[in-house]
Amino acid sequence: VLYYQGEMKDLDCMNTVGIVGARRCSQDIKKKCYELTEKYVEENKVIISGLAKGIDACAHTACINADGYTVAILGNGLDICYPSEHRILMDRIKEKGLLLSEYPPGTKPTKYAFPKRNRLISAWSDKVVVIAPGKGSGALITEGYARKYSRKIELYEVK
């Protein structure tokens, strides 16, 4: 079962790009994320990410600002905003894109939920872009699933 809020489009026939990476990142890394996201939106790609701090939020924001369609896959119920400071971004995604979760309403985020969320990001993406992942980063879990699912992978190390 998948729960959703927002505008559900036929994602099976769309070109989708998952964008994940560092939660703590410099302005240079965020700039690279914005540039890549804008390029993919110009190519009519759907941007998929996980609403986490850092690269995820940057990708969703850049996509919306470029009038693209973004999907946020959550590691909790749709009625819970995590992280809480992303409430405005979450509301913008509901208006201009799609929130998606395999967790029923009321489900709080746990450390076990995020690797499962990362699995869905890879599964729904034709290509996964990993930007400046740190050691032990959840972005590397997403990359691992992308390899398992034979997805295209782009890795960007930005200093």
Functional labels for PLM-detected ranges:
Residues 1-159:
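Glycine-biased, small-residue-rich flexible motifs in mid-sequence functional cores and linkers
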